[in-house]
Amino acid sequence: QFSSVPRRKYLIRGIKVQLPNNAKVDISTTQRYVVSTGATETITSGVGHIGRVTYTGIWDGTFGAATWCADPAWCFYNLLTNTRYGCSIPAVNLQKFEFYAISQYCNELVPDLKGGTGEEPRMLVNVLINQRKQIFEAIKDFTSIFRGQSFYGAGIFSVFQDKPETSRYLIGNANVADGFFEYTGTSQASRHTSCTVAYQDYQKLGEVDFEYVEDVDAVSKYGIINKQ
């Protein structure tokens, strides 16, 4: 007997999106969060990363059948090109290999920071968009998932990602006027030394959780200047 109607949550797979023909989606493991115990139970056997995309060989630019995944790059590509609920941008106006490179970086395995040797994909997306919003706002929200930015120029929509790369230009004193750099500073109040991040925990079916992160050296120098 319940005193009120129980609140239910579901872990579902969303829409199917086009993926490169050399892509494979990991669907080997399904988990559920048990509210009464706070534990996570594995329903099917196998060690996997739900929705992660991996690639075999070199991509020739051809897409395969639409498949569900949790890849932020190709979900974003779908949002841009879809003519029913997206931006209706023709595929010829997109640099698809930029999305491919972003996808590879997002799906690399990194430590899960749970105290063991476990790993998890660097970036995944599991969101529900069920309200109308300005397209530029939607694009900004989506690119923030993979630390990206986008711009439109010369008839081409381009997207790039903030990630480690080889230096493209080395600039020294000989490259600037009079051979000297001019530096500008920022106020101390804007130099955040710690951050409190709110996020929806996938293992808890979307329950909001918080994570506190700080720069130890910066805290010792400026004190705690927190950003939420």
Model-predicted segments: where are they?
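Polar, S/T/G-rich
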Residues: 1-146, 153, 200, 205
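Surface-exposed, non-catalytic interaction/assembly patches
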Residues: 47, 126, 160-228
